[in-house]
């Protein structure tokens, strides 16, 4: 009878300890979905206001407000504003005042053994990119852009766009939107610079399509990394010292009894 009571108390203590550790473990916040409320992607953390995608009140192809291909605002190829490749404004590639010009000075990454272990499983840490990792190759997503010309252009030129993305561990971000925002910016920037160095230039249509493609790939990468992060956390909880010792003690009592 005494052994039975001891075994029962040990079982209760084991379950309570395991549950307490599980609830206390840090997890990244999913953010409640794509672009829903609060300080969300796009445009988050943009000191120059011109990160992907361009900001403004207008939608795709509108004549005012910062949409794609507009004559005024922050769209692609504009003579004024902060879009890609503009002769005026503070947000273009390589310009001193824009947000993209700051990529040349990545912040010094902090050493974290958990991140290094995660990198070994997910991808190699890329040197010179502030601790970013390069994900595994993906099949380029099937995307419809709303018109036949862009759909056909994407099918014919998809090989020109990246099939891997750069990212940091998910536990460095508060939600999915922040992860995707950072992932899109660094991946597009790195691919554009590398390709331009080889003598190949991108058109306005290329840039629009590439960002949509990379965005979808970054969402997929976040989902993969989140799942792997939770699995690693569950394994660490299960095999941490207190639960293991209690479980072994309980099994010994049950066998002896």
Swiss-Prot record:
GO molecular function, one term: identical protein binding
One Gene Ontology cellular component annotation held by this UniProt entry: membrane raft
Designated gene of the protein: PRNP
Protein name in UniProt: Major prion protein
Reported function: Its primary physiological function is unclear. May play a role in neuronal development and synaptic plasticity. May be required for neuronal myelin sheath maintenance. May promote myelin homeostasis through acting as an agonist for ADGRG6 receptor. May play a role in iron uptake and iron homeostasis. Soluble oligomers are toxic to cultured neuroblastoma cells and induce apoptosis (in vitro). Association with GPC1 (via its heparan sulfate chains) targets PRNP to lipid rafts. Also provides Cu(2+) or Zn(2+) for the ascorbate-mediated GPC1 deaminase degradation of its heparan sulfate side chains.
Highest taxon in the source lineage: Eukaryota
Residue stretches of biased makeup (Gly residues): 55-101
Binding locations of Cu(2+) 1: 64-66
Propeptide feature: residues: 235-257
Stretches for region 5 X 8 AA tandem repeats of P-H-G-G-G-W-G-Q: 54-95
Alphabetical list of Gene3D superfamilies matching this protein: Prion/Doppel protein, beta-ribbon domain
Disulfide bridge positions per record: 183-218
Organism annotation: Neovison vison (American mink)
Protein localization: Cell membrane; Golgi apparatus
Signal sequence annotation: 1-24
Associated disorder: Found in high quantity in the brain of humans and animals infected with degenerative neurological diseases such as kuru, Creutzfeldt-Jakob disease (CJD), Gerstmann-Straussler syndrome (GSS), scrapie, bovine spongiform encephalopathy (BSE), transmissible mink encephalopathy (TME), etc.
Entry-linked InterPro entries: Prion, Prion/Doppel_b-ribbon_dom_sf, Prion/Doppel_prot_b-ribbon_dom, Prion_copper_b_octapeptide, Prion_N
Chain segments carrying region Disordered: 27-114
Annotated Sequence repeat ranges: 54-62, 63-70, 71-78, 79-86, 87-95
Keyword terms, alphabetized: Amyloid, Cell membrane, Copper, Disulfide bond, Glycoprotein, Golgi apparatus, GPI-anchor, Lipoprotein, Membrane, Metal-binding, Prion, Repeat, Signal, Zinc
Residues that bind Cu(2+) 2: 72-74
Residues carrying covalently attached carbohydrate according to the record: 185, 201
Subunit structure: Monomer and homodimer. Has a tendency to aggregate into amyloid fibrils containing a cross-beta spine, formed by a steric zipper of superposed beta-strands. Soluble oligomers may represent an intermediate stage on the path to fibril formation. Copper binding may promote oligomerization. Interacts with GRB2, APP, ERI3/PRNPIP and SYN1. Mislocalized cytosolically exposed PrP interacts with MGRN1; this interaction alters MGRN1 subcellular location and causes lysosomal enlargement. Interacts with APP. Interacts with KIAA1191. Interacts with ADGRG6.
Entry's family note: Belongs to the prion family.
Region entry Interaction with ADGRG6, spans: 25-41
Entry note about domains: The normal, monomeric form has a mainly alpha-helical structure. The disease-associated, protease-resistant form forms amyloid fibrils containing a cross-beta spine, formed by a steric zipper of superposed beta-strands. Disease mutations may favor intermolecular contacts via short beta strands, and may thereby trigger oligomerization.
Keyword Iron in annotation: no
Membrane topology, record value: Lipid-anchor; GPI-anchor
